[in-house]
């Protein structure tokens, strides 16, 4: 679809006359700020692995006295929220704008981080894990689009790839902070004032590591089956413990959430979103903020290309055949099928199980809680 000469002249005149909509921001700075959302994605999905061993501790020791079913639900509520967020995130960004959507998500990330940190019980934890999951899913649908629409063609692939890099960096950061916080606390410990069980099993007044209590379970070679073990723990008179270490692990992701909220407000909106709303002058002003004339050349051709693409998208939308257009176009169909295949394979590898529960699995393999939390860092690397 060619552009009439008169429209080209209008585009050229608009590019010349329209000033930047704000201070110039390099595409590197824009990517660094936007992918804080990706970093939060990775941190919030990975941090729970180190928090779970502490969450299992009794309430008086600082934990939430989790059961295995509740442990699974804590991971599941985040995934349910992520599924809903992924579906609605694109709708939100189409309606309000990519930048505006990321600003909202930064607030949701912060709310979820603080909510999980100060959860008094597991049911409140469920609610805020769902909130975090929504932010995670919506970020996965918004951040890559924002990067792709703002990046110049010459480095678009590299810029969008930063999204995935920051996700795994967030997971590595979560595993590393878990290990550091665990080491600072000396591993899960509790102080027992008395043991009201008929058979003390060697547990009397004093300070014990949580591993010593866990070793009483039949699944770890101890004498107590599931219900017997839970009854034994309930009959312990606990003075205190360091189980609240999990709160420090969870609260740390509030820092990048605040940084994202501040940083994204200094960045321009997507020029392509402006064009979709018919705001051509705003699109030109936004492009001028993130383009380097010496490296990216004049904006006339880019704006013209964006207008042509937008016109095609509108035609397909009005004809109601957007999906049919993708399916009939060989290279688009191939991209879609490859993307679906990779997404399915990625999930069937069981990577989420390792990410959430590796420390628990390693404990059953004979490692101490502290060693298993530290070993999880290798998974992040």
Question: PLM features: what roles do these ranges have?
Answer:
Residues 2-292, 298-301, 307-381:
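Transmembrane-helix signature of 12-pass secondary carriers
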